[in-house]
């Protein structure tokens, strides 16, 4: 095969992303491929501001924050064994995985 595989991990919980990235790197290194990463990408924060009351008190507001964490892993000189190991790998729910070949 010998092609570059790029894996992007995304989640709202940073510990899930880090554990998943560590699991992928350990699995790929066991098959003999070269791994670059996990590279942390910028954290995307969305802030929502809402009124505490439904009708009056405009000055009384509450803010909520939703952060998404991302990691990037590049795999070089992959073999069929590497791809099989990645297909069989079980990652926790709550982690979005995007793979580009």
UniProtKB/Swiss-Prot annotation:
One of its GO terms (biological process) is translation. The keyword S-adenosyl-L-methionine does not apply. Keywords: Ribonucleoprotein, Ribosomal protein. One of its GO terms (molecular function) is tRNA binding. Pfam families: Ribosomal_S10. InterPro entries: Ribosomal_uS10, Ribosomal_uS10_CS, Ribosomal_uS10_dom, Ribosomal_uS10_dom_sf. Part of the 30S ribosomal subunit. NCBIfam families: PRK00596.1 (NF001861), rpsJ_bact (TIGR01049). Belongs to the universal ribosomal protein uS10 family. Involved in the binding of tRNA to the ribosomes. This is Small ribosomal subunit protein uS10. It comes from Parabacteroides distasonis (strain ATCC 8503 / DSM 20701 / CIP 104284 / JCM 5825 / NCTC 11152).
């Amino acid at each position: 095969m010998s092609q570059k595989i790029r894996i992007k991990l995304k989640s709202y919980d940073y510990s899930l992303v880090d554990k998943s990235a560590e699991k992928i790197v350990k699995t790929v290194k066991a098959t003999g491929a070269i791994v670059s990463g996990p590279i942390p990408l910028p954290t995307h924060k969305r802030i929502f501001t809402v009124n505490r009351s439904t009708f009056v008190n405009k000055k009384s507001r509450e803010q909520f924050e939703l952060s998404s964490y991302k990691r990037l892993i590049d795999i070089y000189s992959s073999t069929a064994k590497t791809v099989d190991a990645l297909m069989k790998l079980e990652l926790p729910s709550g982690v979005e995985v995007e793979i580009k070949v």
